[in-house]
UniProtKB/Swiss-Prot annotation:
The gene is TESPA1. Residues 485-498 have a biased composition (Acidic residues). It is found in: Cytoplasm; Endoplasmic reticulum membrane. Required for the development and maturation of T-cells, its function being essential for the late stages of thymocyte development. Plays a role in T-cell antigen receptor (TCR)-mediated activation of the ERK and NFAT signaling pathways, possibly by serving as a scaffolding protein that promotes the assembly of the LAT signalosome in thymocytes. May play a role in the regulation of inositol 1,4,5-trisphosphate receptor-mediated Ca(2+) release and mitochondrial Ca(2+) uptake via the mitochondria-associated endoplasmic reticulum membrane (MAM) compartment. The keyword Phosphoprotein applies. This is Protein TESPA1. May be phosphorylated in response to store-operated Ca(+2) entry. Residues 331-351, 461-521 are annotated as: Disordered. GO terms for cellular component: COP9 signalosome; cytoplasm; cytosol; endoplasmic reticulum membrane; TCR signalosome. Pfam families: KRAP_IP3R_bind. InterPro entries: ITPR-bd (IPR029325), TESPA1-like (IPR043444). Residues 466-475 have a biased composition (Basic and acidic residues).
Amino acid sequence: MEASVLSPTSWEKRRAWLRQSRNWQTQVLEEEAAAALQDVPDPEPSSLDDVFQEGNPINKIEDWLQDCGYSEEGFSEEAGQFIYNGFCSHGTSFEDDLTLGAEATLLAANGKLFSRSFLETARPCQLLDLGCSLASSSMTGGTNKTSSSISEILDKVQEDAEDVLFSLGFGQEDHKDTSRIPARFFTTPSQAKGIDFQLFLKSQVRRIEMEDPCLMLASRFKQVQTLAVTADAFFCLYSYVSKTPVQKFTPSHMFWNCNHPTDVPSIRILSREPEPQSPRDRLRKAISKMCLYTCPRDRPPPPHNTPKRNSLDQVVLEVMDKVKEEKQFLQQDSDLGQFSQEDPVPPAEGKKLPTSPYPCVFCCEEETQQRMSTVLAPSQTLDSNPKVPCCTHSLPIEDPQWSTDPAQIRRELCSLPATNTETHPAKDETFWKRKSRARKSLFQKNLMGRKVKSLDLSITQQKWKQSVDRPELRRSLSQQPQDTFDLEEVQSNSEEEQSQSRWPSRPRHPHHHQTFAGKDS
């Protein structure tokens, strides 16, 4: 079969049959055209064109419409006869060109005008208007044959009389397409169903509930995942600045690595944490997830972890520790100096003055003033490094033999503070005022911004010698203004008493002797 189909003899037979069919069709068309020319009388005005003549226009329009319907019915019958008899065209553009060529030769040969009836029989269809309906088309009763050329489609469609009349201005109402549709199509609604948006939304909600909400967007859409990571980065920065934990968009097993601001941001996937076993841990974890302002604690804090102190309290404690250390250091130096240093003043009348192992009143006052000076300015006190003299204050008694009874010495020493308190009440008041001002200045004044000059021992000794010679200068030095710096006052008083202990003046001994005598009496 394949050889017979593809053989050259079969192709030749097909070509010969095609040529014969074309020649036979052209011969038939020429014979029909010649017979029509012989039967056609002289051209007269057609009845269809009587509309534009004088007379009653309404009757002429009705006649024209009836003639249009008659011509359509006649054409449909003739078309059916042509198809039944086998005179239907094969539907190729070449045959259409042959038909037009035959008509052109007939027109040129005879030189006569063809009537509309001949054009309808020779070319069955009028020139088409693609906007016309199928009801007015000539193909309603014709064949269902598929057209393959534009000329055939144009021939099969006729003009619509209603469209022509509405175009010419006839008709009082607006021309609507619904007027041609029967009323039975509008009595009942359409049974077609579109998209039910409520059902669609319900299915979407059901799918969201079945899937994991944390993994739904981040795993499906790359763009949403990128936006979530970016949002987490900004939330991480916000939580670092505001010191409040913030819930993230990304799943719990993924987090934004923002430990250091210079680190490159990256996403690390961690292993899932084990679920807490005890109800207390589960309740704590649930509360930490629900509340944004509570920091989740995976493990309890260690017992040795103490709460952080306030910065001001920490500074005060550090200052007090330093003061205690410096006090202990100064006390050790004073104890060593009591046994090492000798008395620089020679005794009167060749008698040696005994040294008492107990501190006297002057040494106690000097020690307290030195402690206050270390509290105010420990660095300046260490720089000056004043030497604490030993307690060598002599107590002149009428008996040339010094008593070595310790009980008597204790009684005498205990009586000295009382005597000193009675004789110098104003000095104690000024001392406590200075101490209170020193405490206030420790926390209110800026010690680093003010410069304090260290006082040398030689300068103090020179001032003391001048004050011995000039009592007015000593009185002015003792009555200093209240707005001077407290550290200078404390140090000057301590240096004065040190010099008094080294070089005791003559008029003070009778005063003490009289006080002691009055106390014994």
